[in-house]
Amino acid sequence: MKTTFLDFEQPIAELEAKIEELRFVQDDSALDISEEIRRLQKKSQALTKDIYAKLNAWQVSQVARHPQRPYTLDYIQGLFTDFVELHGDRAYADDAAIVGGMARFNGEPVMVIGHQKGRDTKEKIFRNFGMPRPEGYRKALRLMRLAEKFRLPILTFIDTPGAYPGIGAEERGQSEAIARNLYVMAELQTPIVCTIVGEGGSGGALAIGVGDRTLILQYSTYSVISPEGCASILWKSADKASVAAETLGITADRLKANGLVDRIIEEPLGGAQRDWDAMFQSMRRALTDTLAELRKQPTEAMLGARYQRLRAYGSFKEAPAR
């Protein structure tokens, strides 16, 4: 797969293009230019490290949306075995923007649920661009209740711009479906680990995001609204998205500092999209550690702590009047 570079990665793209050109020349000639290729590769790695060390919030949001990042089904293939996908909400339809089913993680049975985006135009439309409708959240809820019945830990993967705002979705009870999930997830008597792997967009993310631990990838985001949406409301222009991104505090480090996430999972150099295998290894370590920790907790203590976590969302302090 040819790497897609973002706007701020253009210096890296130019170096990588030069490296590819030299590889082509080397294959078609007797010249040995391997040393020059290695030099440029080191330069590219150093440049990537330098650029990614200075990313602002708006640039991080662009990385979180990168079209080549692993999606839920990719993590399922890379981390789990014996996956059996379960379909439908048993009330209206099967929403392809939410995928889920039973699987084994390190040999132990679990329930996996997550948002799913598409790669090409046809799949994006089929997956509704990762924006679930009410039936998607009701499907997720059905699987969670099934997990509780069989005492299966629940692992959710969050990556959505938000819940689908269409008229049909609203008529079928979008807000009720999200609220119902929050209500039920707060009381499920089984461990829940939520991992933000891309965009964590508003209630669409929170509807499968109430858990005992919330993990986030280094270059993922979590927010009540997209930077563009916030800018359009406050400044009447999406051009202020970069300002909105900084103000919203959507990045992993800000979220960790505010107590909204528990652990930041380090991504490979250049983001998860650059090395899926390395990302899967980091994810496996994080999930293994987190599940081992939760299994030691008594159920009542776990539920009490989970409820307090949910209640703490949106807490604030009043500043002195000026």
UniProtKB/Swiss-Prot annotation:
Residues 39-293 form the CoA carboxyltransferase C-terminal domain. It is an enzyme of class 2 (transferase). Component of the acetyl coenzyme A carboxylase (ACC) complex. First, biotin carboxylase catalyzes the carboxylation of biotin on its carrier protein (BCCP) and then the CO(2) group is transferred by the carboxyltransferase to acetyl-CoA to form malonyl-CoA. One of its GO terms (cellular component) is acetyl-CoA carboxylase complex. Pathway: Lipid metabolism; malonyl-CoA biosynthesis; malonyl-CoA from acetyl-CoA: step 1/1. It comes from Thiobacillus denitrificans (strain ATCC 25259 / T1). PANTHER family: ACETYL-COENZYME A CARBOXYLASE CARBOXYL TRANSFERASE SUBUNIT ALPHA, ACETYL-COENZYME A CARBOXYLASE CARBOXYL TRANSFERASE SUBUNIT ALPHA, CHLOROPLASTIC. One of its GO terms (biological process) is fatty acid biosynthetic process. It holds the Pfam family ACCA. InterPro entries: Acetyl_CoA_COase_a_su, ClpP/crotonase-like_dom_sf, COA_CT_C. Belongs to the AccA family. This is Acetyl-coenzyme A carboxylase carboxyl transferase subunit alpha. It is found in: Cytoplasm.
